Amino acid sequence: MGTLVLSEVLANADKYDEYLDVYVADDRDPVPESEVELVDYEGPHTPKPPGKRCLLGIDDIRIVLDTWSKWRGGRTPSDAERCEAVAFYAKYDSYLPVE
């Protein structure tokens, strides 16, 4: 699959299998340019990628981004806004409020 970056995965979340988890580096906050790894949590046991943590599953990412857009009148988020919304949800288990 090659190197994946968070902005590409978030922008194309509808194209990925819903049973994939998105892993990011343990030691930093996710940004659009973050390299990610996708792990199928429905397949055979796959160990956590070393030095990475699960950000969210693709199924949850789709819901977060759909909610972000609905709360903002159907607007399409930028790469930075997608990343912010997903990181916020992953950290607080809550949708990013409208400012």
Short names for language-model regions:
Residues 1-47:
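Extended, charge-biased low-complexity segments
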Residues 34-94, 98:
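Amphipathic protein-protein interaction modules
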